[in-house]
């Protein structure tokens, strides 16, 4: 007899290169497939390395979206009845949008001293640095300038995100870290080329108590040890 499998209850989807096409959009075919799954009672759960603020509104508007795994599994959010408003709540220009309050169901933060040590390595790279904290995508003016220059190179959809308010621009990232090292979900550095990223990897691996991965050959992502999307699921 053919083996019977239990009905699918949940579909977890990465964003870049999976749910999103190369232009950073959800295709009509994908949208229709998701709607068919939702009609059968299946949960659709985006699982991404991005923070909540960087979940595209186009994704938050998809049918069935309520729960989302962010920062490689460092945070799991319940977006409630207004997923788009929950995402906008983490924008720097949140007052310009209708917002709602998301609930964090799981938070696996970096230990304070670990976050400080990892941040010091990030700073020494003099590259495009992103700090993810409480759903916010924090960066600085130098990093935004590097990101703008890189956008023309058609890097990954994550690296080419528009600055539409989803980024919180810090005047001084080091000073901010001195006050908020206790609340770090993830640190992410985008380099100019894969060789620079590969050269930096050993220094990140040397930091005790971290998980180090690469979402693309040009970046390095750091979270607390043990954090991954599978554990979050």
Feature-to-residue mapping (PLM):
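Active-site phosphate-binding/coordination module
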Residues: 28-152
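Mg2+-dependent phosphoryl-transfer enzymes with acidic/Ser/Thr/Gly-rich catalytic loops
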Residues: 2-10, 26-28, 39, 205, ...
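Flexible loop residues that form catalytic
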Residues: 16, 73, 192
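Asp-based phosphoryl-transfer active-site loop
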Residues: 7-23, 118
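Conserved acidic, metal-coordinating active-site core of Asp-based
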Residues: 125-128, 132-233
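Structured loop/turn residues at beta-strand edges in well-structured enzyme cores
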Residues: 6, 63-64, 182
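Short alpha-helical
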Residues: 25, 53-54, 195, 228
């Amino acid at each position: 007899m053919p083996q019977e499998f239990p009905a699918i209850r949940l579909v977890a989807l990465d964003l870049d290169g999976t749910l999103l096409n190369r232009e950073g959009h959800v295709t009509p075919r994908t949208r229709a497939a998701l709607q068919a799954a939702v009609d059968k009672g299946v949960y659709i759960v985006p699982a991404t390395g991005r923070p909540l603020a960087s979940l595209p509104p186009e994704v938050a508007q998809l049918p069935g979206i309520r729960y989302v795994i962010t920062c490689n599994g460092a945070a799991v959010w319940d977006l409630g009845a207004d997923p788009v408003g929950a995402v906008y709540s983490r924008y720097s220009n949140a007052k310009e949008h209708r917002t709602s309050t998301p609930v964090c169901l799981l938070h696996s933060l970096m230990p304070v001293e670990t976050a400080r040590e990892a941040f010091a390595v990030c700073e020494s790279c003099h590259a495009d640095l992103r700090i993810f904290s409480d759903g916010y995508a924090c960066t600085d003016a130098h990093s935004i300038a590097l990101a703008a220059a890189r956008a023309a190179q058609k890097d990954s959809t994550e690296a080419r995100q528009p600055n539409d308010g989803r980024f919180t621009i810090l005047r001084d990232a080091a000073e901010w870290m001195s006050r908020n090292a206790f609340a770090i979900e993830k640190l992410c550095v985008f380099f100019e080329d894969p060789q620079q990223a590969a050269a930096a990897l050993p220094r990140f691996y040397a930091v005790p108590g971290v998980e180090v991965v690469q979402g693309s050959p040009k970046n390095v992502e750091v979270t607390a040890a043990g954090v991954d999307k599978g554990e979050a699921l």
